[in-house]
From Swiss-Prot:
GO MF entry, a single one: DNA binding
Name this polypeptide is given: Recombination protein RecR
Keywords: DNA damage, DNA recombination, DNA repair, Metal-binding, Zinc, Zinc-finger
Zn finger spans (C4-type): 58-73
Transmembrane portions of the chain: none
Domain Toprim span(s) in chain numbering: 81-176
Protein's organism: Halorhodospira halophila (strain DSM 244 / SL1)
A GO biological process held by the record: DNA repair
Amino acid sequence: MSVYSPRLRELVEGLRRLPGVGAKTAQRMALHLLQRDRDGARQLADALQRAVDGVGHCPECGLLTEEERCGLCASPQRRRTLLCVVESSADVFALEQATDFQGLYFVLGGALSPLDGIGPEELGLDRLQQRLEAGEVEEIILATNPTIEGEATAHYVQSLAAERGVRTTRIAHGVPMGGALEQVDQGTLSHAFMGRRDYEG
């Protein structure tokens, strides 16, 4: 017999879906919201519902947005000749905070992983190919994570760019191998970004 009521168990299991949240942390969060902060719980539930219903992906770059086009793609101040390819919206947020990059982004939504059934189609690489064929992009900056999947993805994107004569650079590896960009401190990320180099695959 479970000590949790059905609704409390449902809340704990829901919180466990969050990255880095285990059973004990989920239980602490649930108990805090129900015992000490019911108003906060209602605000959280409302904000989550609005985000789930109203936030989608920018059709140009894939960044999370509630607008028809994200603010970066819509901005006339951004350099359209520079395109930084990243795995997630979290990577865009990290780079925007740590660097003075003024180009545009392309968010893949993951990395190539054949064992997990993630191929070029699942990452929207056909849309990236169309952007390259339009001829506006002069340099692609590869900012995928330094993992096996991230490197495979970088190699694939580099081959697409090379076919169209687009220069490809890779952010420097001040970022630890096996790490995720969103978890790297701003100083390290800024140094890695400024030290990017040509990428030959």
